[in-house]
A protein has these predicted regions:
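Conserved, mostly hydrophobic/aromatic
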Residues: 128, 183, 213, 312, ...
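N-terminal metal-binding scaffold of metallo-dependent hydrolase/deaminase domains
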Residues: 1-38, 358, 364-365
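Active-site core of metal-dependent hydrolases
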Residues: 155-276
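Divalent metal-dependent hydrolysis catalytic cores, especially in the metallo-beta-lactamase
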Residues: 61-66, 79-108, 121-134, 161-175, ...
């Protein structure tokens, strides 16, 4: 199958090209060409007042469309989450489980493994957020399940989760270096979060190889004059990346903008999205612009990656090109996946076509 798409601009992930056509054969980028260079039998699909950009990547969300994965623990909830992601221009996602019972974690691993083996596209793997976090910074997590990591538990999750668990959020002050190294040696991306670490503790974790932090500012020790905390350590270490939530509730837009100035290419977006549910360990209540637990504790967002992009440009004041990179190029870089987040000749591509004026999704190649 051969297709050609013409918009005002194509953002490849590296550069912005004007007036050129994206030519695709069998879902592989055949080239980015001048309109007159196309084969004569190709009909060009035209999208005026739009631009083409790589599809988005979300490394942290818990469910969608009424299905919370940690409660349902079935492939149907992964399908529902995938559908939710696609409505916001996101073609790749990391399903996330907050602090939970070992039984549920193991069931989640089994289900994600089954889904990955089915050949369905979109799911990158499982992100375990907890249980090895600091109860002082638990946020909406269930304190009864929070613990320091017994080695036998770590080894069990690593054994069962091989090739399935791709990311773990933990509090470095709760974990021995040996445990952190053990997890990283299994090829799992370790992210520091839900942590009350001092600046020294956080900096040490980054120095021994922890490459990232989870939802900057939220559930972490703040930056203060006499104690820079984890936020200060993240700002200070030029090798560390961090996710951030951009909807004005979890983090003020000015803080997003300031952090972008401080961190540049090291900052990327997640949605942290949950869905309404009244059963199970995590009961999320929709409050219009956020989700909370029944007691009012902030528990997640109602964002898509598309609405995140729009907020970044219109409310945080970050340039469109950088906002696009924060939704695609930079998380792909953290994953060290050269095939994600860019439009390149010879590669399979997922892309969005977005209205330049409204920043609304017009077309996605992966629906």
């Amino acid at each position: 199958m051969r297709q050609a798409f013409l918009a005002d601009e194509i953002f490849t992930g590296n550069e912005t090209l004007k007036g050129q056509v994206l030519f695709i054969e069998n879902n592989i980028v055949s080239g980015i060409l001048q309109p007159g260079s196309l084969p004569s039998d190709i009909t060009v699909e035209k999208f005026p007042d739009c631009f083409i950009a790589p599809a988005f990547i979300d490394l942290q969300l818990y469910g969608g469309n009424g299905k919370l994965f940690s409660h349902s623990l079935d492939t149907e909830s992964l399908d529902a989450t995938r559908a939710y992601c696609m409505t916001g221009g996101c073609s790749r996602f990391m399903i996330t489980m907050a602090t939970n019972s070992m039984e549920n974690f193991l069931k989640g691993i089994e289900t994600v493994g089954e889904y990955l083996s089915s050949g369905k596209k979109g799911l990158l793997g499982l992100h375990l957020e907890g249980p090895w976090i600091n109860p002082v910074k638990k946020g909406a997590h269930i304190e009864a399940f929070i613990k320091k990591p017994p080695r036998k538990d770590v080894e069990l999750l690593l054994e069962k989760g091989r090739g399935i668990v791709k990311m773990i959020t933990l509090a470095p002050e709760q974990c021995d270096d040996e445990i952190i190294h053990l997890i990283m040696d299994h090829g799992i991306l370790v992210s520091a979060g839900h942590s009350n670490a001092t600046y020294q503790q956080a900096s040490h974790a980054f120095q021994i190889g922890v490459p990232a932090a989870t939802h900057l500012f939220n559930a972490m020790s703040p930056l203060q004059g006499r104690e820079p905390g984890m936020v200060g350590a993240i700002y200070d270490d030029t090798n560390v990346m961090s996710s951030i939530i951009c909807e004005g509730v979890h983090v003020d837009y000015a803080s997003v903008r300031i952090s972008k100035k401080m961190m540049g290419e090291r900052l990327f977006f997640i949605t942290d999205a949950v869905t309404s549910i009244s059963e199970g360990y995590y009961k999320h209540v929709y409050k219009g612009d956020r989700y909370t637990l029944p007691d009012g504790t902030l528990s997640g967002s109602c964002m898509t990656m598309m609405s995140t992009l729009k907020n970044s440009v219109e409310k945080a004041g970050i340039s469109l090109e950088e906002s696009l990179k924060m939704c695609s190029v930079y998380p792909a870089g953290l994953l060290k996946d050269p095939f994600l987040g860019k439009i390149q000749k010879g590669q399979t591509v997922d892309f969005n076509i977005i209205n330049k004026k409204t920043l609304e999704l017009v077309y996605s190649s992966f629906h």
